[in-house]
């Protein structure tokens, strides 16, 4: 009877609200399964964490166009176990020299859409800088999976289809996006269809062979500048060629005996995080128990 009761019990009394996933050797977490698999394979063949991050970054440029594209920017924190040193690289996109703050004050739409708001992309420079200084495998080896994925195609997810439908109004304003992501009936890429990007494959291949210069100088840089200037933007070839990813001093604090390191300015999130932790340290969170207020902290 007790065995039957255990099987039919509908409420399981977990001992913790957290359910961590544990890996014995390494772990890769991304927003797309193709990118996760690529990062896993890089680590499996002996690459380090930076190798995997770079490979994943370029893979996301293929499979997560709304957020992982080569036209974006970001920040990266790198911890070296041997030296216990944390390095931080700022590769945030930069405003073109000709852009002025007053251009974006009066019109809310101008702040969000169109070529005027495009900044000089930093992702390629940042990922390549991280690889050059901290990677172990060759760049062609890291980018080969993304080159093949863009050339041979991948299965369109429900997520990608939904995002293209959700953003259709603004996406259709751009002819390149219109031709790339929508059919003649202006319907977005169909779920489970195979999406191929031969031009992106060639772009990543050029980066793999010639590094940063392939993207920020020459044919690709000229295309980006021409596209921007002919559509009301300000990005020039000079803006592209002068872009550099930079090392920044990371921010450090302590929290209940732990050393917390995060990205410093120009990123703002890290500063807010550390300030929040410093405030929370003054409260006994364990004593408050499980309640709505604690969950929403």
Which sequence ranges carry the predicted segments?
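Noncatalytic scaffold domains of N-terminal-nucleophile
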Residues: 4-37, 41, 49-210, 215-217, ...
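Extended active-site and interfacial segments that coordinate phosphate-rich ligands
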Residues: 280-281
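Metal- or metallocofactor-binding catalytic centers and their adjacent structured scaffolds
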Residues: 291
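Conserved small/polar residues in nucleotide/adenosyl-binding loops
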Residues: 295-297
